[in-house]
Amino acid sequence: MTDVIHELAATLEQKREEITAWMAKKRAEVPIPIYGSVDIRDSGWKVAVVDANHFPAGFNNISETDEPYLAELMKEHIDRLSPDCKWVHLYPESHTRNKGYVENVATIKRLLETGGFRCTIGSPELDGIGSLNGISGPLVLDPVQVVDESLNVNGESPDLVLLNNDLTEGMVSGLGAHKVFPPPHMGWQRRRKSEHYECLQKYVEEILSLIHI
């Protein structure tokens, strides 16, 4: 069965330029989130994207050699959509005991700082905790309160809020007055996997037609 995948890989390589052009065209048609991840299942005879996450938690798995490149891409995205941004506030999940997740947040912070941004971390839910224990050590949190529906971090207002919270429990307060990446409406409080597959299907059909499968 694995030969099917090998044959498909060869076809994709042959169609590389056409696929690249198709993807560039599709990216130009929709707003692209600052980050994201997909869950892929490979059964040996079929490969499928089974989920998409707009608030990924796997940055701690990135190799150190890739970090400068990713920091540059993140900076380019922020500069393009928020050219005056100097300060990014990272709004995390409240997973205070998940060291892997904490390390993910620490890595995002490092990428932002490598890109030249000031980066603070915290949320009203985590206010007063002080720090979280990550794999490489403690991650310092900044005091965050909601004042007039705006996030107040150490008495100031950040230029941009970077969400790393999938909003499973619903919308959080304090975001309305800020520019927020990714948009809060992409959280799980509104998204459905059935809708994800409906949107994905048309792209699947287009690419299959392009590569004649």
Regions found by a protein language model. Name each.
Residues 1-131:
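ATP-dependent carboxylate activation and anion-phosphoryl transfer catalytic cores
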